[in-house]
Amino acid sequence: MSVESFTPTAIQFSQGAASKVKSLVDEEGNPRLKLRVFVTGGGCSGFQYGFTFDEDVADDDTVIEREGVSLVVDPMSYQYLAGAEVDYQEGLEGSRFVIKNPNATTTCGCGQSFSI
């Protein structure tokens, strides 16, 4: 029997998203804040993305650092986000964090809901 080590596909934390997180953290004046990205059931397509700021990191969380700020993902959400990119976009419909997820087979027009 052979045993292979499993290396999860990294989640990308874009330059634009990191810059926006840094700006928001600086604005709050709390350098302990991290952007937590998570997946929950719901939305038009079955799952939806969520974003919140959090000071805490659990032992089993994945932490991705860029520009001195951190993106945190819990293990359940990571399985749906492996290979995805967390970005920040500004456009006519407003400014927001977005996830470009190659695992999603369908996405809602709002960009916050998806199915696998």
From Swiss-Prot:
NCBIfam families, A to Z: iron-sulfur cluster assembly accessory protein, PRK13623.1
HAMAP family registered for this protein in UniProt: Fe_S_insert_ErpA
The protein's name: Iron-sulfur cluster insertion protein ErpA
Species in which this protein is naturally found: Stutzerimonas stutzeri (strain A1501) (Pseudomonas stutzeri)
One Pfam family named in its UniProt record: Fe-S_biosyn
Any single biological process term in GO: iron-sulfur cluster assembly
Cofactor: iron-sulfur cluster
Quaternary organization: Homodimer.
Disulfides per UniProt: none
Binding-site residues, iron-sulfur cluster: 44, 108, 110
Gene3D superfamilies to which the protein is assigned, alphabetical: HesB-like domain
Note on how the cofactor is bound: Binds 1 iron-sulfur cluster per subunit.
Family: Belongs to the HesB/IscA family.
A cellular component term, taken from the record's GO annotations: cytosol
Highest taxon of the lineage: Bacteria
InterPro entries: FeS_biogenesis, FeS_cluster_insertion, FeS_cluster_insertion_CS, FeS_cluster_insertion_RrpA, HesB-like_dom_sf
Keywords: Iron, Iron-sulfur, Metal-binding
GO terms of molecular function: 2 iron, 2 sulfur cluster binding; 4 iron, 4 sulfur cluster binding; iron ion binding
Function comment: Required for insertion of 4Fe-4S clusters for at least IspG.
